[in-house]
Amino acid sequence: MTKTVAIANRKGGVGKTATAHALGAGLIRKGYRVLFIDLDSQCNLTDALGIESGSVEASSLDVLEGSSEASEAILQTEGGDLLPATPQLATADKLIEGVGAEYRLRDALQPIARRYDYIIIDTPPALGVLTVNALTASNKVIIPAQADLYSLTGIEQLYGTIGAVQHFTNKKLKIDGILITRYAGRSIISKDMRGNLEEVAQIIGSKVYSTPIRECIAIREAQATHTDIYSYSKKSNASKDYEAFIEEFLGG
């Protein structure tokens, strides 16, 4: 059965795209069939997989609007299959509305879902129609968060949206866990905030993954070269941390 995973947080700059890319690439390395979906108008995941967003004939927005089938819009890249983004996703809240708007991604994926073991969705740093579509289509949500006060606020806001989705559009949605990213283990603030994140995880009925993703320049360098972190720097801290996270994810 296909497992669909949304990577979400209201706050930007917490490593959503890096986590989506690393999770999908790591699963591919283990032999799983993976589809990446980019719902962020910044198109960072699309770019990381080597696709110029301005050159795509059909995007995730076209699929959500119903002007293209998912099977027609999916691109095969060296890093995996991708439903690419477009900058026009920034206007999605105005373009995608009306009865059943929350179900458009879920319904669009049904004809092709069986081709994949995992569908990984990178969401925008907002709680509008795109994130609601991602959550409605997903079995699980992973919340990347830095060990800082602003991430706590972002999680609280996201949790409200997740609760609404669980109540109205997707009762099976589960918060798989909070993944600490850009972690500075020697920082007293980071250590204290990690404790706060663990308290928040208990409140929302989830967990903090045991392995935080350490701050690592290799992540940005890999993105700049359109390469996954494992291929770019197998021995980097980020590569090791994401590998450990994936083992925990699969075991959970």
Labelled PLM ranges:
Residues 1-252:
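P-loop NTP-binding core
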